[in-house]
Amino acid sequence: YKRQVYTAEQYAEVVRQLRAAYGDRPVSFTTDCICGFPGETEEDFRESCAFLKEIGFLKVHVFPYSRRSGTPAYDFPDQVHEREKQARSREMNAIAEDIRREVLAGCEGSEDDVLLETPLSGTLFTGYTRLYVPVVVSAPGHKSGEIVHVRLGSYDGERVRAEMV
């Protein structure tokens, strides 16, 4: 239905190959998930949730399927009820956040480069590592657009606290 050109098994194999190729160096993955696409069963949904756990995505953008006139899926049979789409989206978001916490906990103590983006106050900046880990770091004497080397700390539910090294 969704015009995927690959299977979950093929995707998982590519992830395994990439992780093997990078060895001890970390690699991260992000994805988008649509909940409640026409024809999605409870079993399909459970398989999708299990797949998220298997891969260990750093970030998952979850959203409910939205029926749009003029699209092929508009007339597909087995439209999923709006309440069910919303419930599945909430559940998948919770699962994705648990996975994110696990992935980011595994980064604690590691070092990486961060592109400083948004100044918050004084010397405090938000930014992202090369692996798309969101951080907040105090970087006195630096400005947005610069790259600094940091040690990653704990995840606060929004960003990883980091310190310059």
Where do the protein language model's features map onto the residues?
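Conserved non-cysteine loop/helix-boundary elements of the Radical SAM core domain that shape
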Residues: 2-59, 65, 70-84
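Terminal RNA-binding accessory module
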Residues: 75-165
